[in-house]
Regions:
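Bacterial N-terminal signal peptides that target proteins for export
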Residues: 1-10
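N-terminal signal peptide c-region/cleavage motif recognized by signal peptidases
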Residues: 16-18
Length: 134
């Protein structure tokens, strides 16, 4: 594969990744309605949703930064393909603490929900965020 085709491929891939990351926010209002959140659960639900949104937005920002770094690397005559792996590792490490925090908040919320609500919430997470919680 020629360098030009390789650059084009990676550029298109990065554009797709950045658009996908920015469109990744699920409809948490819909989840709240499906869960029928009670007043004593509302505060933890809001905290959980906030921490989840922060983690997802961090992925979007990291994807944009990743795209910029890779675009700069691909513009070189001899791109360093190891830079792709380093940039990916940096992105994962940058967002890992936010996903841990979000996971901890979901566990706290589960403790307040009844069994049916927990199943609804877990189904929602698998459906909308499965790529992040595998």
């Amino acid at each position: 594969m020629s360098v030009v085709r390789l650059r084009l491929f990676f550029s298109l891939l990065l554009v797709a990744v950045s658009f996908r990351a920015s469109a990744a926010l699920p409809n948490f209002d819909n989840l709240e309605a499906r869960l029928k959140i009670r007043p004593e659960q509302k505060e933890q639900f809001d905290i959980t949703v906030g921490s989840t949104k922060r983690a997802l937005l961090a992925v979007g920002i990291a994807a944009i930064q990743f795209k910029e770094r890779l675009t700069a690397e691909l513009s070189k005559n001899n791109p360093d393909f190891r830079a792709f792996a380093r940039a990916n590792e940096d992105m994962v490490e940058q967002t890992r603490p936010l996903f841990k925090e979000a996971g901890d908040e979901w566990k706290r919320l589960y403790a307040l929900l009844d069994d049916e609500q927990v199943e609804i919430a877990k189904s929602f997470l698998r459906e909308h965020l499965g790529r992040f919680i595998q």
